[in-house]
């Protein structure tokens, strides 16, 4: 018997043990016939000259099986063959950065016990007046086969060896109708009929499952190539679907995982992309392309530590562009940390914006840092907008290993900021849920624990205050809301609720004050504006009431109650203006320069305010615009101005030693004198004597 031909085996699995496992697992899913039905009508002869095979060429491959004992045996694989398999399976030719290469070829390996009995080498199949070589041959592109015929005087030839099952004869012309699919000689204990030759889909399979799918027309390398084409065209969803199908066939291929990560990145599903890259690195720790993708993803997520780990991993020359981005990100994060420690929130906003502009455009923690800065600056609406812009990653995504920002796990930090913003806007139930989740993620961090405790106390105080208000116990409700404000001194909801209590108690000044606190952080807070406008009406400050109602009318164009309140306030204001004119009020500050005019002004009925000022004094110049505002705000009050430099005799008669000085008279009697008062104190004094 002649030499046994050893042909190359296509790389098809990640490991020999993997093939044993997969073939055994999927064997029951495949219906493999024990033999092929053949027509017995072909006249052949066993007389075939040995020299007749000298001109044989490559032919279409046919299924070859060994003796019946070969199916039950467990042939061993040499160490050299295992090495060739391992080398082949580490190839990542399917990477997006380099277009798909040709498919590896598939040929048969004849193991011991599977040698042909022909001493001439390649057996021949006779068809009509020609005979054909049955040797499998693949083109360099990994697929094609051909057949070359030679004329022979012999008309009845039976090929040597065991091409046909025992007792069966090939039908004339059968070789030309044989399937063009390539064959793979497999190992293992699975039942594949006679021998271990099974059909292959052209190469690229990695397991028994891959062989099965290939029979249905699916090929992982072809799917990868199609996915790459879709990716280049910008059809990322279609590319992702194709990569998914390739991974289903070959889950142990790192290149497929990396390509899937690229498609997910293009779809802005960064959390899932990170997980795919991590899986690719787990499969092949030396896969540099996956490390590079991971570094780029971590830079976009603002995770500098993880990015550095993959940019500078052992055996890889760092990409200078990524390295520069990493260093810039680290610089901005460091400056942001320093600004937060000293409460320089404007600098913190500036540094987070710079880090995002540098490429960390999908970092939840950086956007949360900006939201925290706005929250501390009492700009609640801006903070809420930032929270709404926080990138939504896969809810199963967690940085691996965990990354911290400001000493907190980044996921816990983001949840803490969201909880505080929710609490400031009255979304108390959401605040509790997020604070509890943050505490679960970072149980030992004191700042996270403090946020959770504060949220719970504020929610408890608000609930207690609402219950007391509903039962008509307004004074006790004020105390309950005040307890909540001790924990969160900028909570606009608690201020607004307490303002409602003050209104019910008839303390309209306090109601206006609490509404002002609420509107300081939320300028468009509708409830606070409604309550302040109503309080202004009770105080007779109709001009201020009209301003609030006009704003509410623009915000609530379909609200009939707001429209009625606005008309009523305007009517009252007009009537008051006409009344003031009839009584001699002119709604502007009047200058007084002589002692006689001063005495006449003091004798006017009602409240009169005299402002002694100097044109060269800075404080006088600062408070003068406010006096003009008060003149319009309180039309039933007389406002006068005395320039001490121009009326020195009057200033001396009134003993004016420092400016600005204010003197108040009611019905001709002096009731109060103030030197350099604050705006609030001056207005409070006017309101006190006006009522």
Curated annotation (Swiss-Prot):
Residues 19-39, 83-93 have a biased composition (Basic and acidic residues). Gene3D superfamilies: Glutaredoxin, Tetratricopeptide repeat domain. Disruption phenotype: Altered vein pattern in cotyledons and primary leaves. Mutant seedlings show increased sensitivity to osmotic and salt stresses in roots. Residues 51-79 have a biased composition (Low complexity). Residues 1-153, 174-209 are annotated as: Disordered. Induction: By salt treatment in cotyledons and cold stress in pollen. Repressed by auxin (e.g. IAA). PROSITE patterns: TPR, TPR_REGION. Residues 94-108, 118-140, 175-189 have a biased composition (Polar residues). The thioredoxin domain is inactive. This is Inactive TPR repeat-containing thioredoxin TTL3. It comes from Arabidopsis thaliana (Mouse-ear cress).
